[in-house]
Amino acid sequence: MTQYDYIIIGAGSAGCVVANRLTEDAETTVLLLEAGNPANKPEIQTPLDWTKLWCTEVDWAYFTEEEPYINNRKIYCPRGKVLGGSSSINAMIYIRGNRRDFDQWQELGNPGWSYQDVLPYFKKSENQQRGASQFHGVGGALSVTDPIAPAVTSQRFVEAAVAMGYSNNPDFNGEQQEGAGLYQLTIKDGKRHSTAAAFLLPILNRPNLTTTTEALVTRLLFEGTRTVGVEYMHEGKTHQVFVNQEVILSAGAFDSPKLLMLSGIGSPEHLQALGIPVVVDLPGVGQNLQDHLASPVAHQATQDLQPAVTSNIAEAGLFLHTESNLDAAPDIQLFFGPVLWAPPAYARPGSGFASTPCLNHPESRGSVSLRSASPNDSPVIRLNYLQSESDVQKLVAGIKIIRQLFNSNAFDEFRGEEVAPGADVTSDEALQAYVREVCDTVYHPVGTCKMGTDPMAVVDPELRVYGVDGLRVVDASIMPNITTGNTNAPTIMIGEKAADLIKAVARVPQQASVISS
């Protein structure tokens, strides 16, 4: 019988961190299971090529169901199926979130998750190019750097925002988040620095770490309500492995709830309808899905704006309030890039520039459920984008602000025709229709195994799944509410904090008995 102290399911943004930290103790054995491949696809390394990874072998390439509030469109949701998970296919933007996000998590009944509590974990993982400070760390595994060769239009975007009265903010992860600046990136020596590159590849030779790729976990194994192991498929065969300590589920906001439900943890009605025996009645599994969404404003350019090979495309940004409540976190984040990023129906050949208003705290909530009892079927994803009218209105407000920026003097020498939404789309009604027609994901799904103490919570503040022993969820799915900005950095922080929580309660090993299939 094969046994490890810990089994980690998913070598993604959090899973790689947990694997690194738990194996720092040479006596602790860890099995890391990843459904995807090693991260050796060359486009992973090249920052500019991240969109070329979509719908390839390193992408789960999920689609939502038809979304009723956005003209029944199905939204394509790329997710990393590779060592490093989505940190190997994302746009590499390092945004931690707003301090209010984490203070709110604590206020929702999650002690230990306030901004002051989590800041040390952000700093621990970081090797900040600018050096150490009150807010930043050096010597950590993850390289955080300034853009190497930002486009002149990205600089102009910041200048235009400052001229409009927004503050110049060189550090969105520092004293304040509001304002305009260039994004810092998880790049090292001009190449993507995923969590696989930062936390996993340097330690692959640790004798107490076993990493298995192309391993699809099919279910968790229980004795009563104690988690004793996992079952997975590898090279066409079914394997069972067992744990002395804990199973750590780090499969992401779509696949962590999917695996819990396949294993009998979730809404009894849903599980019984699919013939899955119920282990724990936990109705919150797969609920509370939140994501950032955006609708672009795109211009043709009057001159060639080819971004550098080290560009992540979304080079500059602006965090702002469309409402008067300045005590709240910014409700809109703008991304700017020196490319003609337009919806397919609006796309034009040639050079351009674009900006998207991203809704930081959508009111709409979605869900993840099972399509069948087969682990090979993709989950049923319903985002419910723009169910709330206020979400539409905020995106329209964001489009209007971008138009002001693009019509400023800073863009005079570059401004060509507006191709999306188009210069004739001016009324609020027309802009609202445009938003419903084109709004798209910013690839930040979270919240489907939320942390908390209310009846819909899935994990407690130490990330332990309610109703069973020896099982934690450690990834973006535990966020009670989505953070303000890109979600990769807070997911890495969750991995760092979880590793300490796990180490603090390591217990005397118990012998697990074999479960027959």
Per-region residue spans from a language model:
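N-terminal redox-cofactor-binding region of secreted/periplasmic oxidoreductases
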Residues: 1-517
